[in-house]
Structures are given as structure tokens and as C-alpha cells.
């Protein structure tokens, strides 16, 4: 499937599911009422059972129609979409779920086109009159057309589809649907399939029979659970270690996207989920299982909650059978696999991520259209197809890392791709969804991943964000860190001379490097000997490492009286000296400072300006020429 076709299919499926998913609560309410109060329910009640008919006939289709119209034409589109949907409902003798999916967007489209046509042409003072009457008149016309045309046409289409379904069920062909459903799920079409196709068919069948098998074709957690169990027993590396947690999230939380990377890293496992899905559907067909309403999310808890009286054995058996077959097939595939390196899910995830980036001419760290500049990033969104389970978990992992890194000015949230706001700075999506996200918000930077719980990617991103923030804060950080070392009483300019530059130094520890800088300040007549200890004491409080291979040691506020005159020494350590707790916090340039006023600001400004050019830092760290140092710092 080409990239454009896949994106179009995903977008269409997402549009269908977007009409249903916001209203899932209403479907669940209807399902619970049906399961409890109909004559065959748990608590039969003739009076309360009267809610069932009007809800499925009017409430649910109207909600879908309103939502579909709103997706296309905003609030006015929702109103006209609902009016149009009413025409479809009255024009047919069956629940109009498919009809509402046509009528709602049609109403939204028509009012949107009208609004665009009259934009700027309405005289002042007549806006409300035109808006109200246009919606009413267009809604009336569309309702009549829907009543006369769309309703009867959809009724005929629904009967044809129902006949096809009945034929498949009668001839035991329904399990073949898994051949298409399971691979489509891996392409993130699971919500589109479940809510865009199976839910409308299932609601109609449930209204007639009290339950529907369609609600468990895609939502059955068995096939995915079988794959994860196989990883737990026969997998290798971090894939085996992480499969247990993924299984809990998948089976109890209903987030099916969690197992997709495990299949993607070993594509042969698609066979396992297909056979598992077919087994589950076959079991449901034989034992007459099904649900009264969509199970969303597709967890075992939601499935049991939507199971009608008398269908528990069938549904549980279908889940167990699907899980068992998927597990056995996966185990056989694992045992016959000779590709050991693919057992590590993080390695596989990173490999696919890097290969996708490299195929587009980008570096692995810049998948999508990420630049090296993350300094402006303030809003990060982890996006998936529905904007719920998988992206919410990914956002949770990244948010904790960002918060732990102290990046309080960066927000991390999750969203559906279609709802990405225009002010987002960085978008993180699954690699199969990145192109859609890039079309939705082309101005943002984008990162692709294959596993929303890829801790390694989030850690790498956080480190880059920290480095970018440190780069911005360098000058402020220097000034703030030195506020306790000088007062602002003089304006004389301090000039860095050749006697203050020491190249080719070596030191085993930062204490040794700080002591040398302090001793040179003493020899230069800038400070009293006690100032050296004050520099060591200051380092114990917080590291004076600024990043970009630079450290700026100086004394404590109590030692300012030990400063005789402002002085700066430039010490070069080509092999580096570790200044921070992290292994990469290594300083090659150690700038010792003693100041009572702001005479040193010229040198500090030159240093912080140099941070903007990595080549300058590299030259300062490697040069053997004092004159070159002076030239670079006195630009």
C-alpha cells in the first residue's frame, strides 16, 4: 500500500470513528439499559425497557449526525447535520447509523459552503438573521431530501449488508474477516474498523437479536494477548522483560496498540494474530456469543461488562481460544526463528526508526522534520490515531522525564492527530502516522517512533531539550552564578592578557583544576590565598559546569573581601575534566574568575557568545596559540 493511499484510508477511517468515539458513553448507557431491563435481561422491567427503542432509533443516530456535521462545519454544521439526520431516521424503518454517518457530514458540508459563499457579503446588523434562517432553511431542505432519498437508499443498503452478513454467518465464513482485520489493526486502523464499520452493523444486529458478534471481532483481546505471552516465555532481551507489563496494559486496560510493536518487530507474527482472530470469531459463531454494545476500550473488563446474560461462556471461551491459538503459533514461530538480534524490542524499534529517517535523507536523531534547534520548543504533543490510550501512556512517560529534568517551561500532552493545535512545537507519533501528522501541522517539528513506550527515545529527546535549554540559559546562568561574587560599583574594563591564559593543562579531578585556577589568580595578584579554598567550597554547593565543555569556577559570597582586584584566568584542558555528576559533563575550558565589580563582564560576554558556535569552542579547546585565544575572545 502506497504512502498516500494508506494516509487516505487512515484519514477516512479516522473520520468515521471520530463520529462514533465521542459518543461511546451514550452507546454504553444504551447497552447497559438493554442488558438490564429488556425481557431477557438481568433485571427485566417493562417500564424502563421503553428507553431502549427511542435511544437506538433517535438518540444515537442524532448524536452521530451532530458529531459528523460538527467535524465538517463546526457548531452550525452540527446543528444542520442533526436536522438532516432526522430526515434519514424518519425515512426508514430501522436504526439509521449508516444513514447518520452520511447525513451528518452532508449537512455540515452544505452549511460550510454556504457560509464561505456569503462571507463578507452580509450587511452589518443582519448577521444573526442570516445565520439563523440559513441554517433553518438549508436544514429543512436537506431533511426533506434525506427523508425521500437517503433514508430509503440506506435502508436498502443496510438490508444488502445484513443479507451478506447472514450469508457469511450461515456458511461459517465470518472468521475469514480476521484475514483483513488483524493486519489492518497493525496499521492503526483498529478504531476505524471497530467504530466505523462494526459498531453500526453491531448496533443494528444487537437491536434485533439482543447481542452482536461484530462487537468482538476487532475488540477481542485474545490474539494480542497470545503474542505477548509468547514473548514472555520465548522472547529474548528487553522484549521479554517488557512483555509482562504490556500484557497487563493490553488485557486489563484495553490498549491494543501496546502489542503492535511486538508484531512489527517480527512480521511473521501477523500470521499468529490472524489465526487467533479467526479462532475467536469461529468460537463466537459456534457458541452464539456477542456483546450488547461496543466494548471500548477493548479490555476483558469492558467485554464482560457488555456481555449479555447467557453469553459469558461463549465470550470468555472465544477470548481464551483466540489467545491459545495465537500463543501456540507465536511460540512455534519463535522456535523456528534464527534471527536472534530481532528479539530486542528497543533495538528493533530504534532500528526501524533510524532506517525510516535515513531513507528520507535525515539523520536518525532527526526523524520526521526535526531540526537540531529545540530551543524554542515549549509545547510537545504525543499523538496517535484516537488520542487516547497509546499516546496518553507515551505522553505520561515523556512528561515524567521532562519534569524530572526540571524543564518546567515545557508542556507534554497527548492528542488525536486530527485535533493537533496549530501552536504545537513538537509532535511525536508512530512512524505509520507521522506523514498524517505532518500534513495536519506542517509548521511543527516531528519525531517518529514504533513504540509509544520507547523510554530510550524519550530519554534522548529529554537530553537534547536540556542541552538546548542550557544553551539559552548560559549567559543568564553565568551572570546569576556570579552575583554573589561582585558588586556593581565600578565601570572599569578588565582586559584579558596573555599572562592569564594557560594551555595544554591536565587534571585528574575538578578540585585539581579549580585549585590551579585559584593559584594562578593568587600569583597574578588578583586574590588572597584564602580565595582558593573559597573556590573549592563554592564548587561543593553546586557545580560551576555550564555545559558545552565550559566551567566557570569562582569563590563564595563570603570570600569577596579576599578579592584584591578583578581577574580572570583561562585554563585549557584538551583531555577534559569531569565537573558534573553525569559522564558527559566534562569541561575542557575552565575559566577561573575573581571579581568585586563588573569588570569581568567583557570576558564573560565573549565566552557566552562563543557558545553559539561549536567550531569556536572546538578551536579554544584544541589550540596551542595564546594569540588565537585572545583573538577569539576579543571578537
UniProtKB/Swiss-Prot annotation:
Residues 378-473 form the PTS EIIB type-2 domain. The record marks 538 as: Stabilizes the transition state in the phosphoryl transfer from HPr to EIIA. The chain crosses the membrane at residues 24-45, 50-70, 134-155, 165-185, 273-292, 313-334. PANTHER family: MANNITOL PERMEASE IIC COMPONENT, PTS SYSTEM MANNITOL-SPECIFIC EIICBA COMPONENT. The modification Phosphohistidine is found at residue 554. It is found in: Cell inner membrane. The modification Phosphocysteine is found at residue 384. The keyword Cell inner membrane applies. Pfam families: PTS_EIIA_2, PTS_EIIC, PTS_IIB. Its EC number is 2.7.1.197. SUPFAM superfamilies: Phoshotransferase/anion transport protein (SSF55804), PTS system IIB component-like (SSF52794). An intramolecular phosphotransfer takes places between His-554 and Cys-384. Its main location: membrane. The keyword Transport applies. It is a multi-pass membrane protein. It is an enzyme of class 2 (transferase). The gene is mtlA. One of its GO terms (biological process) is phosphoenolpyruvate-dependent sugar phosphotransferase system. The EIIC type-2 domain forms the PTS system translocation channel and contains the specific substrate-binding site. Residues 494-635 form the PTS EIIA type-2 domain. Keywords: Cell inner membrane, Cell membrane, Kinase, Membrane, Phosphoprotein, Phosphotransferase system, Sugar transport, Transferase, Transmembrane, Transmembrane helix, Transport. One of its GO terms (molecular function) is protein-phosphocysteine-sugar phosphotransferase activity. This is PTS system mannitol-specific EIICBA component. It catalyses: D-mannitol(out) + N(pros)-phospho-L-histidyl-[protein] = D-mannitol 1-phosphate(in) + L-histidyl-[protein]. Induction: Induced by mannitol. Repressed by MltR. The phosphoenolpyruvate-dependent sugar phosphotransferase system (sugar PTS), a major carbohydrate active transport system, catalyzes the phosphorylation of incoming sugar substrates concomitantly with their translocation across the cell membrane. This system is involved in D-mannitol transport. Residues 12-342 form the PTS EIIC type-2 domain.
